[in-house]
Amino acid sequence: MSFSVVVLAAGQGTRMSSSKPKALQTLAGKPMLSHVLSEVEKTKPDQTIVVHSPGHRDLVKNVATNSSEIKLVAQEKPLGTGDAVKAAIPTLDKGNNILVLLGDVPMIRAKTLKLLKEGVENVDILVLTTKLENPYGYGRIKRDEQNNVMAIVEETECNDEEKEINEINSGIIAFSREHIEELLSGLGASNKK
């Protein structure tokens, strides 16, 4: 099955007190986005799209030039992760499954991305999660009785019970093409991220 990768790099990095977007902060001498794109390239996607904020196109383009052909898409307004993915939809090749990841996860490895790529051929959505001792600041994973992921609840939207959940969203999700547009159509302005 063909697949596309969407790398979200429109985050402003305000918590880092920097004018540079979060994905362009440096780690081991290279922007985090560069580390991510290097690993993405190893998975041999049919297409790679980087979503950026309008004011940072040139900065993102400079980082992306070292990778294979990459399409750049601007998220016109900072309306969160779901909206950033929505911005990429018109550019995506039809029929491709989609792997979405954040541009600020420099420790991700191609092996993990390949497992998600292969796994989404058998299911509609795969969410890469992890458990943290202190999950403050992260979206929590809500599961049903059969252990299926039912929702990702952002920290700012968590009630007291949900704040006790220590399984969090890594920001890396694989979708079958048939379901991503349907899911994004249900995204409303009330979603903070």
Positions of PLM-derived features:
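Conserved N-terminal catalytic core of the sugar/cofactor nucleotidyltransferase
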Residues: 31-118
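Structural beta-sheet core signal
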Residues: 5-7, 49-50, 99-100, 125-128
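Short acidic-glycine loop/turn motifs at beta-strand connectors
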Residues: 142-148
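Catalytic-core segments of class I nucleotidyltransferases/pyrophosphorylases
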Residues: 149-193
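N-terminal nucleotide-binding beta1-loop-alpha1 segment
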Residues: 1-18
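Conserved donor-nucleotide/metal-binding helix-loop-beta segment in metal-dependent transferases, i.e.
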Residues: 111-136
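Short catalytic helix/loop segments, enriched in acidic residues and glycine
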Residues: 19-37
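Short aromatic/basic micro-patch
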Residues: 26, 107, 174
